[in-house]
C-alpha cells in the first residue's frame, strides 16, 4: 500500500516521534511505501521514507498549523494514497494516532468569548473534524482516560476506536549486565553507589513537573539532600531551570543532561523515576522504568499511572496534586528498601503486554486500508 503519514514536527527525542518511527518502520518492512509530511524535521532523514517538508510561515502557531493543513490537503488531493495516517489532529485523515489529550476538556465551561478566539476555534474545530459525528476517521487510542473524555465530548462510537496496548521497546527490558551498566554510568558522571540518583525524562519541563521536582529536592532533609542528585533528560529552556535550581539552593544537586539516545542506561543507573507531570496522555517513561526494574513516583494524571498501581512497583500521587505530599513521599522512597518495588516491576514486565503497540497499530492500518479499497 501507499501510505502517507502526517505530523507537525519531528525531533528524535519526542515520544510521539518515536512512536511514529516504530510504526512507519514496520510498515516499510512489510513492503508498504512510506511518505511523510511535516512542517519541520530535526535530525537525520530516514532513507526508508519520502519526507516532504511543508514550510509554514505565520505569526501564530495555530496560523502555521492551519497553513500546514491547507498545504497537506492540496498534496493529498494530488496523490493517490491508500491510507493517510495523522499523528496530530488533522481534518480528513483516515486514521488518527491519538497521542494528544482532549483539547476541549481543559475548558470547564466554553464561554462566548472563547468561541470568538481564533486559536480556540481552530484547535476545537480540528478536534471536532477528527472525533465528531460527521467524521469517518478511525482513532487509534493509547490512553483509557482520554478515550473516556473523547466519548464524553463527542459521542464517538466504538467502531471508530481501536484500543492499543503500550509500545515499550523490548530492548528497554533489564539486561543481564544491568549492574555493569549501572556502575559504568555512575563512574562516568562521578557518582558513587551511596548516592541517590533520581531520574526525570521528557521534554517540556513545565508539563513534566521539573519545577515540582526541584521544590521536593530542596525540601529534603539536609543530610539526605547532600547525597541526592536529580538527573533531568530532555530538551527545554535549560538556563531557566538551572536558575530555578540555584534559587532553591540545589544547583549542585540538579543536573540537566539534554535530550539523549542513552536513556536506557540511565534507567538502570538511577534509584528512582520521578514523574510529577501536570498532564501526560500516557507517560511512556513510566513503563520504560517498569521494564528496567526502576521504582517510580508519579502523578495520577498520567495515563500509565494505572500500571504503577496494578504492579505495586512504586507510588502514585493522587489528584489534586499536593507539593507537600511529594515533599513527604520522595524522602520516604529514597530511604526505603526498594527490593520489592524492583521485583514487582520486573514481574509485571514479564506478565503484561507492554510492548506490542507498533505491531497492533500496523495491523489496524492494513485492515483499514483493505476496508477503504473495498469501499472504493
Model-identified regions with their sequence ranges:
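A charged, aromatic-enriched C-terminal amphipathic alpha-helix characteristic of glycosyltransferases
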Residues: 338-366
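Short hydrophobic beta-strand element within catalytic cores of glycosyltransferases
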Residues: 295-299
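A short hydrophobic beta-strand element within the catalytic core of glycosyltransferases
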Residues: 273-274
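A conserved mid-protein helix/loop that constitutes part of the nucleotide-sugar donor-binding site
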Residues: 17-22, 196-219
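Aromatic "clamp/platform" in nucleotide-sugar-dependent glycosyltransferases that forms part
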Residues: 259, 278
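Short, structured helix-loop element that forms part of the nucleotide-activated donor/catalytic region
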Residues: 224, 229-251
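Donor nucleotide-sugar binding/catalytic pocket of nucleotide-sugar-dependent glycosyltransferases
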Residues: 120, 124, 128-182
